[in-house]
Every structure is written in structure tokens, then in C-alpha cells.
Amino acid sequence: MRTDRGDPDRPDDALTPAVRDRRSRVAFAPDPLPADVERRLFDAARWAPSGGNGQPWRFVVTRRGTPGHDALAASLRPGNAWATAAPLLVATVVRTVHVHPEKPPKRNRHALLDLGLATGNLLAQATADGVVAHAMGGFDRDVAFDAIGVRAPWDVGVLVALGWPGDPDALPEEVRAKETGPRVRLPLDALVFEDRLDPAEAAPDDDAEAGGA
């Protein structure tokens, strides 16, 4: 596949809007999501593909102002403290082994991919509905496990903050850049190769993580 470097700060205008316009915002309004909107987000996740249609994902929803939300929010790393303002804090959970009534348990090598596909569907649907959906890996796993009662063979993938967009001006200055800063991605020719991977060309740029997500 031949590509040009393009503009790593700008997606192709022809991309579907749910992909093109998605970003990891951090400002939330306090208003709860209507039940039909909330249901639609998880229905989008439900229809994601998975290996053998195993659907190893689950979602644990906690609502701001409840003990469950407080317990899960306590797992957040300090850099993600802004997520406590989200009306919903969701733990994405995945079953990491195949369970079959007539066979011994076997590790599911594709479980995290399946969970990622389902979570990606949720994020895309949220973007289409004007909902902020921000997935985070910055949390204490032990605290999160205890908060939602997860035990092996289940694992927590990411936490997702969900809610309506809020006022960026109300954010602390050090957090506001996450909301308003540029989105930066590697150019296509650093990601897509014909026939063989070139390790030198595949190395990430030094500034690949700069800007918003």
C-alpha cells in the first residue's frame, strides 16, 4: 500500500464522522444521559465482532453520586481525577479464557482484541450521539477489581468516562490542554507496510504522544 505522509494532525475529511470527529475529551456536564442514549451506546458495543462470536466482554456501569461510583473512582490515577465529574464511570471487563462444558479451559489469545473492538464501537456511537466517551488505562487494578468484584478468569481492560460535553473553561489549566489541544497521529507510511515490516521506519516519532487523543 503506497501512502504519503499526509498531515498527522488532521484526519481525512472523507472518514466517517464517528471516526473523524472522535477525541478523548475531559470536560463533562453534570446532566445524566437519557436511558435510551445510554442503552444505544452499549448496544453498539454488543454488536462488535469477536473470535468465534465468543463475546467475552462485559461492562460494569457506575453512576455519579453512588457508592459504586465512588469505589471505582478511587482507583483512578491522579492524572485522571477529572473523570470523577463524569455522570457514568464504566469498567470494561473481559473473560480471558475459553470456557467449554466438554473441554478444559483454554486461554483466549484474542480476548483483549475482542474487548477493544466492543469498546471502539461504544466510542464511535458516543461520538455519533454527541456524548463524551474517554477510555483510560490509568487506574489501580487492585482497587478497581475490589470495587466491582472482579476475579479470575475475568480482567479489567480500561475504564470509560461517559457524559455530555462540559465547559472547557471550567477545567484547571493543566487539564484543559487535553480538551482543546491538537490531535496528533503518526503518518500512514509509519503504520502501513507492503509485504514486510521495516523496523526502522516503524519506530514511533519522538513526539508521537504529544497533543490530544
What are the roles of these predicted feature ranges?
Residues 1-213:
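Acidic, surface-exposed loops and disordered segments
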